[in-house]
Every structure is written in structure tokens, then in C-alpha cells.
């Protein structure tokens, strides 16, 4: 739970009572509106974990052709989900949806999360009391090498931990988590070879670390979110929770 501290002058009765009440009003955090959360949508939780069976609306025959059809369906679904939270043009939905669910999870964990102040032309996605967060989200059916940009984040943001005096956490979401684990080997898995682990340890020693978004989900104990998690099949259950 976030703790708020009033300025010393409040306790010393050096300001009028009505002003104290106004200060208290703005210092009390708003309760989390769980009903409006994207994490309440079962398909969002399934998408986050890589269970895309809800998109399979036709018989799969040809891998290349099927992937193109699924890409269209994934984009239509993503835009629809984002509009539930942010009505309007949701054509470029991937990054926005990732940031929304990341913010939701941290609020559910009782963390204070906000947009950080821009420093030296750096504008990370979020800041908590303990960390700076950079959110990387991808679709599952995007072709090409766009995801390889994630590999360069530690170098690009190498100065961020010193600038903000906080460790940098690179949160991988959706297709980004899948590729980082199964293709690039920067998340735990078979592709994380000893030499890659050496580089990752170097990043961590310099306060930069990659995190898998699904590691946060299992630790949530809100009924609405658990209902979505319980819809996952046995072979798509989430891994043990990751504790910040």
C-alpha cells in the first residue's frame, strides 16, 4: 500500500483546517477500478501468456497464409480491446495496450506508478518508487526483425539508472516475451546460453534487467483477475510469480 506523508507544517498547525482537508483530499490515492481493467478480459490474459486459440476462427492449412490471416485477426482484436480502455483511434494498439496492462498490474500490487520526468532526452515509459520501467510489447504474428530492437535497449538506456538513481527494468509483453525467451535467449529458457547469461549478468550489475510480464500475473489475488487466469488450460498455466 502506498504511504503518503503530509508536510511538517500540517502537523504543526501552521495552516488553516480547511486547507488541511483540501490537501488530504488530493493526497489520498484513488481506489483501483478493477471493473475497467483490461486484465478483466479473459482473452487479454490469454494473449499475454501466448494462448492465441481464441483467434483460431478457421481451419489451419498453410503456415504462411494462416499467419497473415491471424495477423489481421490479432490486430482487430487488439484494437477492440484497447478501445475498451481508451476510446478512439486504436490502430497502433500494441505499445499502448502493453503500457496499460503494465500500469494495471503495478497498481494492483499497490505500487505507485507514473510517467517519469524527461532527462537528457530520455523518456522512459514509467517510474515507480523503486524502479524505472521500459515496456516492450509485440504482436505474435508480426513478420520481420522489428523485435530485435529489444536487444539494444540496455545500450540505448545505459545512462538511465544513473540519471534517475533507480534500476531500469525492461518489461517484455506478449510476442516480445515469447521472442525474448524462445528466440533471443534474454529471458530464462533453453535459448539463454552461458555466454548470453554472462552479458545479462553484466547488465544486471549495471542496474538493467529484462523481466517477463507473465511473471507478475500469478501473484495477483483479485477475484476478477483470477477468473481470467483460471480460464487458461493446464498446458498454458502461468509460471510462479515474480516478486519485485
Predicted regions and their residues:
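Acidic-basic catalytic patches of nuclease active cores, encompassing PD-(D/E)XK
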Residues: 2-115
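Core catalytic machinery and nucleic-acid-binding channels of phosphodiester-processing enzymes
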Residues: 117, 125
Amino acid at each position: 500500500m502506498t504511504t503518503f506523508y503530509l508536510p511538517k507544517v500540517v502537523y504543526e498547525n501552521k495552516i488553516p483546517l480547511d486547507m488541511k482537508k483540501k490537501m488530504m483530499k488530493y493526497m489520498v490515492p484513488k481506489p483501483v477500478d478493477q471493473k475497467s481493467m483490461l486484465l478483466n478480459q479473459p482473452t487479454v490474459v490469454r494473449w499475454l501468456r501466448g494462448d492465441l486459440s481464441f483467434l483460431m476462427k478457421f481451419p489451419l492449412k498453410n503456415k504462411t497464409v494462416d499467419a497473415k490471416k491471424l495477423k489481421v485477426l490479432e490486430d482487430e482484436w487488439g484494437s477492440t480491446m484497447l478501445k475498451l480502455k481508451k476510446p478512439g483511434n486504436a490502430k497502433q494498439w500494441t505499445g499502448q495496450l502493453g503500457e496499460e496492462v503494465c500500469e494495471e498490474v503495478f497498481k494492483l500490487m499497490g505500487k505507485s506508478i507514473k510517467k517519469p520526468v524527461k532527462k537528457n532526452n530520455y523518456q522512459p515509459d514509467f517510474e515507480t518508487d523503486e524502479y524505472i520501467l521500459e515496456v516492450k510489447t509485440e504482436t505474435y504474428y508480426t513478420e520481420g526483425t522489428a523485435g530485435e530492437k529489444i536487444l539494444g535497449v540496455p545500450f540505448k538506456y545505459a545512462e538511465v539508472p544513473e540519471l534517475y538513481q533507480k534500476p531500469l527494468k525492461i518489461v517484455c509483453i506478449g510476442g516480445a516475451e515469447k521472442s525474448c525467451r524462445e528466440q533471443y535467449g534474454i529471458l530464462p529458457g533453453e535459448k539463454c546460453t552461458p555466454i548470453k547469461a554472462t552479458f545479462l549478468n553484466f547488465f544486471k550489475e549495471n542496474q538493467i534487467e529484462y523481466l517477463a510480464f507473465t511473471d507478475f500475473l500469478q501473484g495477483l489475488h483479485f477475484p476478477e483477475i483470477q477468473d481470467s487466469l483460471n480460464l487458461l488450460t493446464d498446458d498454458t498455466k502461468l509460471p510462479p510469480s515474480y516478486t519485485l
